[in-house]
């Protein structure tokens, strides 16, 4: 085979029928490339008398001064469907990067299958921040691959047993416990929980566990009929509340796993002719800006996005600097407003 001029990795990729990042990984012996493909790439490289650009390789060993934020969200979705909580997180992370002299590369990752290749092969960033309500159970293999490749990364979310990597997240259990205790102190006893309670939604699951623990502390048992799945959108909260009301189960409060779910639930209650909080008290979780401006203003659990952004950036930079780093849980704060004042 003949190539005009000096052969490049793009030439090898074309002849081997693979991507340029795959060629780069094969040439450096990455285990991500299977043996057959690697041998084909190496054979073509030899035939083309391809030489690795050592100057470019040495540049890749230097810090780029850039961090990558991989956001778990479908880029084809309407912007209005993105939880405003993550807007606050993005702002906090951006400010923290600026304080540390780092640029920030933001990428939607809902449709991605290779987190590392999305940034590393083009030398875009020194490490990754994973952000979103990610199903890290399904992503465990990809997280483990990042560890094995020596990729520096931190993730926002609940610290799960056996989960690879460093996590920074709010104390979701305590938040669920505190807000349910508040409802109980208002005299509520039939408290519904709207939000997924499975391990595929670890943040919601921890909030639900805190909710159940608070009920037990007051001598009450959780009732499966009072838990209804919902994701973090107003529409999902509205639908979940409608389904709950259709069951005919008597309730005097709704503990929602997020503010958006709570706001959707309040709409469903109004449509059903029920008053908030006189008939049904409602609480949320996140303390997004809208929580204070809806009517009635929403009682919620505030997550400290400023501290969260700072910790995510600082821990990632520490990892890049080869320093030991541990996961951390951030305290939350109960914010009482009109929607829960049931008494």
Protein language model features and the residues they cover:
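Short gly/ser/thr-rich secondary-structure transition/capping motifs
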Residues: 47-53, 109-113, 266
